[in-house]
Amino acid sequence: VRWMQFGTFCPMMRSHGTELPREIWNFGKRGEWCFDAQEKMINLRYRLLPYIYSTSWDVSHNDGTFMRPLVMDFAADSKTHEVGGEFLFGRSLLVAPVTRPEVTEWSVYLPQGADWWDFWSNEKQQGGQTLNRCVSKEILPVYVKAGSILPFGPKVQYSAEKNWDNLEIRIYPGADGTFTLYEDENDNYNYEKGAYSTIRFHWDDKARRLTIEEREGSFPGMLKSRKFKVVLVGQNSGTGDRPMKGGKTISYAGKKKSIKL
């Protein structure tokens, strides 16, 4: 279970092993904690595909890094220089893998220079402190940097099962933020010839306004129109891997739009 949790936040998710069974049905059945805990992370990985795919493009396009030591983004915080058990998954998610058995608490350092939202509880924490996070076997400590814009896709069994015509866009308030949604044909190298599109999102925290810029680029099969369900994350919005409650739905056909939350 702990490995599956860690693997969920690796650039390429794999169920590693050689001679031992690795498929989740070898560890029980639905309704049993070991199966359910692994299925939870697999479903989360699929829902995070818009974030992961867009971040992969950013890494490739801008010569970036997917799994980032904290010091890369928070060099001014000297404590991050010594943190070796946490990493940033893209620029928004801080992950602290649990690497010892039978523990009930796990120490997590939140870098100074940002506030952080607990992904599972929506509890907001100030940066620059160490927390002892309760960690049941089903929970991996994950924190979202304030100002992050996270796109979530539908629950699927494989990556191309459903299109992204109704993405859930989560805003984690507390700072201004940007995110660029990247899309292409999914199954070839035509993006190297310019066959892709990007949509830039900007969050103005003081004005509580999300701006969706005009779409740039195109590719065969691109969605001409779609909907975004925009959710301002808080204590009553829902948490974790489940679809968020409330929010506002906005129709988008490639032209600039703005929504106040």
Tell me the role of every PLM-derived stretch:
Residues 139-257:
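Accessory, solvent-exposed terminal regions and/or long lumenal/extracellular loops of proteins
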Residues 1-139, 144-145:
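Catalytic-domain carbohydrate-binding cleft regions of carbohydrate-active enzymes
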